[in-house]
Swiss-Prot record:
Family named by the database record: Belongs to the DNase I family.
Protein activity control: Inhibited by zinc.
Annotated phenotype, changing G82R: In a breast cancer sample; somatic mutation; diminishes enzymatic activity
Record Pfam families: Exo_endo_phos
E.C. numbers: 3.1.21.-
GO BP of this protein: apoptotic DNA fragmentation; DNA metabolic process; neutrophil activation involved in immune response; programmed cell death involved in cell development; regulation of acute inflammatory response; regulation of neutrophil mediated cytotoxicity
Disease: Systemic lupus erythematosus 16: A rare autosomal recessive form of systemic lupus erythematosus with childhood onset, characterized by high frequency of anti-neutrophil cytoplasmic antibodies and lupus nephritis. Systemic lupus erythematosus is a chronic, relapsing, inflammatory, and often febrile multisystemic disorder of connective tissue, characterized principally by involvement of the skin, joints, kidneys and serosal membranes.
Family matches, as InterPro entries: Deoxyribonuclease-1_AS, DNase_I, DNASE_I_2, Endo/exonu/phosph_ase_sf, Endo/exonuclease/phosphatase
Extent of the signal sequence: 1-20
Cofactor(s) needed for function: Ca(2+); Mg(2+)
Protein name (Swiss-Prot/TrEMBL): Deoxyribonuclease gamma
Primary localisation category: nucleus
Length: 305
C-alpha cells in the first residue's frame, strides 16, 4: 500500500465505524422512582443511552409510567442535528406483585419499529417458563447493511436461568411462524454465568449447543460492576447469516461506564450493578461489507483497584 493511500484508508475506516449502528443492552438495577430522583445516576444513564442507536433498558419498576417520558425529555432536550429518541415499552411483566418492564429506546432518524408483541408463555406441557416474558420487537432501518432485525429481550430469574435461556429457542420458532423475519438478536441480563449457569449446564441450553446461534459476549467477559465479582451475566446472541456477517469486527464488547466516566465503585453502583453490553451493525453506506466471521473478544478488562 502506498503512503498516499494509507491515510485515506484510515479515514474511510473511521467514517465506516462512525456510521455503524450501535445496539446496546443495559440492566439498570431497580430503575424506579428513587433512581429517577438521583440526578447523578440519571446523568450517567442518559450518557450511556446517548452512545447507542438502539438500547434495551431492563428492570424498569415504574407503576406510574414516568421513567421513559422523563428519559425522552432529557434525551431530546437540545438534540443535535435533529436526532431525537423514541421508545417502545412492554407491559408490566412478572409473577405475583413483582413487576418489571422492558423498554427499547431508539434514534428515530435511524430506525423504526415495524411490529411488536409479547410472547405468550403458555406452551403445551411447559407453562410459564419465563419470569418476564420476552417483548419481541421487529426493527427496520435503511441505514444498516441488514435492513430489518428482530430483537428478543430477556431478564431471567437467576435460579431458573438455564431453563429460560434454553426456552429462547421456542421464542425464536414462534416469531418465525408469525413473521417473515430472518435476522435475530437475543440480548439482556441472562444471568448466564457463575453459579447460575455452571459449565456443566451449557449442554442443556439449545441456544448454546446449536451453532447457528452466535454468541457475541463470551463466557470469559465480566459484565458486573463490583470488583468482587467476575461473571458474564449479560449476553448478546445472533441468528441469521446476514446479520452475523454485518457485525462490525471487534465491536462486540462490555462498556465499562465506571472507567469511562471516572466514577468510584460506589458511584457506579448507584447507577447499576451491571455494565451494558453492545455491538455494531455495518452501515449500508460502508465502502465494503466485511464477510469475516464474528469472533469472541479476548478478555482485556481487569477489575478496578
Amino acid at each position: 500500500m502506498s503512503r498516499e493511500l494509507a491515510p485515506l484508508l484510515l479515514l474511510l475506516l473511521s467514517i465506516h465505524s462512525a456510521l455503524a449502528m450501535r445496539i446496546c443492552s443495559f440492566n439498570v438495577r431497580s430503575f424506579g422512582e428513587s433512581k429517577q430522583e438521583d440526578k447523578n445516576a440519571m446523568d450517567v444513564i442518559v450518557k450511556v443511552i446517548k452512545r447507542c442507536d438502539i438500547i434495551l433498558v431492563m428492570e424498569i419498576k415504574d407503576s406510574n409510567n414516568r421513567i421513559c417520558p422523563i428519559l425522552m425529555e432529557k434525551l431530546n432536550r437540545n438534540s443535535r442535528r435533529g436526532i431525537t429518541y423514541n421508545y417502545v415499552i412492554s407491559s408490566r411483566l412478572g409473577r405475583n406483585t413483582y413487576k418489571e418492564q422492558y423498554a427499547f429506546l431508539y434514534k428515530e432518524k435511524l430506525v423504526s419499529v415495524k411490529r411488536s408483541y409479547h410472547y405468550h408463555d403458555y406452551q403445551d406441557g411447559d407453562a410459564d417458563v419465563f419470569s418476564r416474558e420476552p417483548f419481541v420487537v421487529w426493527f427496520q432501518s435503511p441505514h444498516t447493511a441488514v435492513k430489518d432485525f428482530v430483537i428478543i429481550p430477556l431478564h431471567t430469574t437467576p435460579e431458573t436461568s438455564v431453563k429460560e435461556i434454553d426456552e429462547l429457542v421456542e421464542v425464536y420458532t414462534d416469531v418465525k411462524h408469525r413473521w417473515k423475519a430472518e435476522n435475530f438478536i437475543f440480548m439482556g441480563d441472562f444471568n448466564a454465568g457463575c453459579s447460575y449457569v455452571p459449565k456443566k449446564a451449557w449442554k442443556n441450553i439449545r441456544l448454546r449447543t446449536d451453532p447457528r446461534f452466535v454468541w457475541l459476549i463470551g463466557d470469559q467477559e465480566d459484565t458486573t460492576v463490583k470488583k468482587s465479582t467476575n461473571c458474564a451475566y449479560d449476553r448478546i446472541v445472533l441468528r441469521g447469516q446476514e446479520i452475523v456477517s454485518s457485525v462490525v469486527p471487534k465491536s462486540n464488547s462490555v462498556f465499562d461506564f465506571q472507567k469511562a466516566y471516572k466514577l468510584t465503585e460506589e458511584e457506579a453502583l448507584d447507577v447499576s450493578d451491571h455494565f451494558p453490553v453492545e455491538f455494531k451493525l455495518q452501515s449500508s453506506r460502508a465502502f465494503t461489507n466485511s464477510k469475516k466471521s464474528v469472533t469472541l473478544r479476548k478478555k482485556t478488562k481487569s477489575k478496578r483497584s
